[in-house]
Swiss-Prot record:
It catalyses: adenosine(2503) in 23S rRNA + 2 reduced [2Fe-2S]-[ferredoxin] + 2 S-adenosyl-L-methionine = 2-methyladenosine(2503) in 23S rRNA + 5'-deoxyadenosine + L-methionine + 2 oxidized [2Fe-2S]-[ferredoxin] + S-adenosyl-L-homocysteine; adenosine(37) in tRNA + 2 reduced [2Fe-2S]-[ferredoxin] + 2 S-adenosyl-L-methionine = 2-methyladenosine(37) in tRNA + 5'-deoxyadenosine + L-methionine + 2 oxidized [2Fe-2S]-[ferredoxin] + S-adenosyl-L-homocysteine. It comes from Desulforamulus reducens (strain ATCC BAA-1160 / DSM 100696 / MI-1) (Desulfotomaculum reducens). Its EC number is 2.1.1.192. GO terms for biological process: rRNA base methylation; tRNA methylation. SMART domains: Elp3. Binds 1 [4Fe-4S] cluster. The cluster is coordinated with 3 cysteines and an exchangeable S-adenosyl-L-methionine. Its cofactor is [4Fe-4S] cluster. This is Probable dual-specificity RNA methyltransferase RlmN. Belongs to the radical SAM superfamily. RlmN family. PROSITE patterns: RADICAL_SAM. It is found in: Cytoplasm. The gene is rlmN. Keywords: 4Fe-4S, Cytoplasm, Disulfide bond, Iron, Iron-sulfur, Metal-binding, Methyltransferase, rRNA processing, S-adenosyl-L-methionine, Transferase, tRNA processing. HAMAP family: RNA_methyltr_RlmN.
Length: 350
């Protein structure tokens, strides 16, 4: 179990089973664990005094041995249309991570970060510029959703795990977060309302498939051949495209779930007629959806987004050969909602 610098357990880093064992060791009755889980994960309390159906004695024990340490909102940015709010959360150790609230007609979606920084090195991503600092704990990921609900007063209905970090590089903590956010004692968000994005850690994709969670897996592809993907997405040097596609095929077979392939369009780099033909040939036999993404500009990078008319031609070709494809609706472009940008600007000023 995870402990902080004061050797206290952070209850939001535990799951129900671990809290049950902890409460049993305290000599308390089993139903107390269920009560505590609801306070911690559904109500999102920040103080043990708020757990009003627990005895004062038990609250005192919890205060002595555990913590409800939370990520706190440092700053936020609201898009001109008001449909996107970007939050910067401060962590207890002084680091910061970003989350984004996106308001859709079907509900509110929160994009969470899973690491401080990232070591994947994707060439057009701001999150990876200074490398990986550390993994987030399950509670630190969960706090992003709780904090946004608390700040806005609006229920979160969908989770997108595509903020800073590679989720499958923080596998166990992300799975525990998923368990808690989905649970009845938590926010009870359906697995089919959760999307997890990976740049292609093939062994972890295989492990995830065996869990048979009905989440949506999104694969950051961004290139249709190894030569180009080696440059844009360096993990491809370890797991080549044929290995990635095989892992995707196995994932579909085991889970029965359609995979989303993300393809960030970079002008003059991966958006030619030959690239779209290669992409179509690569994905034509898979149960999949292709999400074309006009890339967000990053100050330290020189990439330019593909012009709209070329994006449309790219989309039309894929559709013509029978593939399911959409162009991602742009939210929050005016507030630099691309991963990592708000954090880096904040840290440069502080």
């Amino acid at each position: 179990m995870c402990r902080n610098n004061n050797n206290k357990l952070n209850l939001r880093d535990l799951n129900q089973s671990e809290i049950q064992h902890f409460i049993k060791d305290l000599g308390e009755k089993p139903f107390r664990a269920d009560q505590i889980c609801r306070w911690v994960f559904a109500q999102g309390v920040s103080s043990f005094d708020e757990m009003t159906n627990l005895s004062k004695g038990l609250r005192a024990k919890l205060n002595e041995l555990t913590t409800l340490s939370q990520a706190t909102i440092l700053t936020s940015q609201v898009s001109a249309k008001g449909d996107t709010i970007k939050f910067l959360f401060g962590l207890p150790d002084g680091h910061a991570v970003e989350s984004v609230l996106m308001k859709h007609t079907y509900g509110n979606s929160v994009c969470v970060s899973t690491q401080v920084g990232c070591r994947m090195g994707c060439l057009f991503c701001a999150s990876t510029i200074n490398g990986l600092v550390r993994n987030l704990s399950p509670g630190e990921i969960y706090d992003q959703v709780l904090g946004i609900q608390r700040e806005t007063g609006e229920r979160v209905s969908h989770i997108v795990i595509m903020g800073a970090g590679e989720p499958l590089d923080n596998f166990d903590n992300v799975l525990k977060f998923l368990e808690n956010i989905h649970a009845e004692y938590g926010l009870n968000i359906g697995y089919r309302h959760i999307t997890l994005s990976t740049c292609g850690l093939v062994p972890r994709m295989q492990e995830l498939a065996l869990r048979k969670l009905p989440i949506t897996l999104a694969v950051s592809l961004h290139a249709p051949n190894d030569d180009l993907r080696d440059k844009l997405v360096p993990i491809n040097r370890r797991y080549k495209i044929h290995q990635l596609i095989e892992a995707c095929s196995n994932y579909i077979e085991i889970t029965g779930r359609r995979i989303t392939f993300e393809y960030a369009l970079l002008s003059g780099i991966n958006d030619s007629d030959e690239h779209v033909r290669q992409l179509a040939a690569l994905l034509k036999n898979l149960l999949c959806h292709i999400n074309l993404i006009p890339v967000n500009p990053v100050e330290e990078k020189e990439f330019i987004r593909t012009p709209p008319e070329k994006v449309e031609r790219f989309r039309q070709y894929l559709e013509k050969v029978g593939l399911n494809v959409t162009v991602r609706r742009e939210l929050g472009g005016d507030i630099d909602a691309a991963c990592g940008q708000l954090r880096r600007r904040y840290e440069s000023k502080n």
